[in-house]
Amino acid sequence: MSSSDKKKSADYYQKVEQGKEFANAGGIPPLLTGSQAQKDFAEVVRADILSSLIEFGDLDHALVLADNIRNAKDWIESRYLDYDAILERAEQIDRRNKESPV
């Protein structure tokens, strides 16, 4: 594994852990103050954390975060992400995890 792969992996697991912490705390708090650029960056971070949880297969925490985002479907689609594809991927991961538990 190259050093860049290790860094990507570490970043990925950090996002997963961060997502679990946010979910356990009731969700990711919205950024109410700051510049529009800071708010836009916060939205990207939210999407990144949510997608990392989905990819990891941690649907329980991902659903808490998705529920926490008002109008999650509109929110996700407004960021050029395909909501139906995300749900389909989450279901595939869930089925795979049930069929072959680690």
Language-model segments: residues:
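Charged, low-complexity intrinsically disordered segments and flexible loops
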Residues: 2-102
